[in-house]
A protein has these predicted regions:
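Bacterial N-terminal signal peptides that target proteins for export
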Residues: 2-13
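C-terminal motif of bacterial Sec signal peptides marking the signal peptidase cleavage site
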Residues: 22-25
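Boundary regions of SH3-family modules and the immediately adjacent low-complexity/disordered segments
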Residues: 27-41, 67, 79-118, 160-237, ...
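SH3/SH3-like (including bacterial SH3b) beta-barrel domains
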Residues: 33-34, 48-71, 128-151, 157
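Core beta-strand residues in small-molecule sensory/regulatory alpha/beta domains
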Residues: 46-49, 114, 121, 125-129, ...
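Short beta-strand elements that form the blades of beta-propeller/WD-repeat-like
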Residues: 238-252, 297-308
Length: 344
């Protein structure tokens, strides 16, 4: 009967071994990855349990990739790249689709020309599309520097109807159409691209030309070239600027409606308006380059994109031969008048 006992022992050992092999598989089943998500909050704590009283087991930061293992009401159990597991509020997470959309937005606009540098007034989210309720992932801190690429408009988030003021007619007609807000497509210092509310960004215009805004809003500006200036024995190079402006209102049907060129007077050591043009139905981006003009030499050139009455976008080329700005017409091109235009 000893052989029978030996068989029983072997069977028992095989059963124990099989159970041990199944345990990790069961563990993997309980902690299988449901999906991948990304942290949209500036920072969030991971807790050991979904309860009023909990222990913090770790922290995650904005943009961090996590694996979602489980979901329970408002919370998701996640695992970080370092293997830490814990519960986090689901509102602090966005899905892979949002991450991929921002990656595509970055790739599609990685070579777009910068229209102006900007500085953020407050902490601001990078949105996938213009709009306060659209998906977002990365958050930029107040004071962060960004490069402005494009402009779009989006309907302002609707709220409660305002209470009529005393003395106003209750039967007055509501304003026509939705209220629109301006949004900038920006690139941050890490190369990430997204949409931000324009009022959250200050265009970082040099003070020397910002003082000539005359109540208008700077949309973009560019240094066309530099000139040598000698002021009381102090030699320096001074940039000459193309500035693109518009009325200080959101929701306009154009990106800009006026341009000005500021050149430096080397005798009076100050900026002067060399050229200005109004009445444009302008569309970003504006392009800056250089071109050879035979006897005039190699001159700075800027190209504006302007809509005509039919809504077709046409390019207009201009050259600066300090202090004169002139339109450069293509063979057979007939200039069109946009509105008031003068030098001064």
């Amino acid at each position: 009967m000893r052989w029978l006992s030996s068989i029983r022992i072997r069977c028992l050992l095989l059963g124990v071994l099989a159970a041990l092999l199944l345990l990790p598989a069961c563990g993997r089943g309980r902690h299988r990855v449901l999906e991948v998500a990304y942290v949209s909050a500036p920072q969030a704590a991971l807790r050991d349990q979904v309860a009023a009283i909990f222990n913090r087991v770790g922290n995650v930061k904005n943009g961090e990739r996590v694996e979602v293992l489980d979901r329970e009401k408002r919370f998701a159990r996640v695992r970080t790249s370092t293997g830490i597991e814990g519960w986090i509020e689901q509102r602090f997470l966005v899905d892979q689709k949002t991450f991929d959309a921002l990656q595509k937005l970055t790739a599609d606009n990685q070579n777009d020309p910068v229209q102006a540098p900007g500085v953020l007034r407050n902490d601001t989210n990078l949105h996938v599309t213009p709009g306060r309720d659209t998906e977002h992932l990365y958050q930029l801190a107040s004071g962060a520097k960004v490069a402005i690429l494009k402009r779009e408009t989006a309907e302002k988030q609707s709220g409660a109807a305002p209470t009529p003021k005393s003395g106003t007619k209750t039967g007055a007609k509501p304003s026509a159409g939705p209220v629109l807000e301006d949004w900038w497509l920006v690139r941050d210092t890490l190369g990430r691209v997204g949409w931000v509310l324009s009022r959250m960004v200050d265009i970082d215009v040099p003070l020397d030309i910002a003082q000539y805004a005359e109540g208008q809003r700077f949309v973009a500006f560019f240094a066309l070239n530099e000139v040598e200036d000698n002021d009381k024995g102090v030699q320096k190079k001074v940039p000459q600027y193309l500035c693109v402006l518009t009325d200080p209102h959101d929701g306009l049907p154009f990106d800009f409606d006026q341009v000005r060129v500021f050149t430096w007077n080397t005798r009076k050591h100050r900026y002067e308006t060399a050229y200005r043009e109004h009445g444009l139905d302008g569309v970003l981006p504006v392009t800056i380059t250089k071109e050879d003009f035979d006897k005039e030499g190699n001159l700075p050139v800027f190209i504006l994109r302007v809509k005509d009455d039919a809504g077709t976008v046409n390019e207009r080329k201009y050259k600066l031969n300090t202090p004169i700005v002139r339109r450069v017409l293509a063979p057979g091109e007939v200039p069109t008048r946009s509105g008031k235009k003068r030098r001064g």
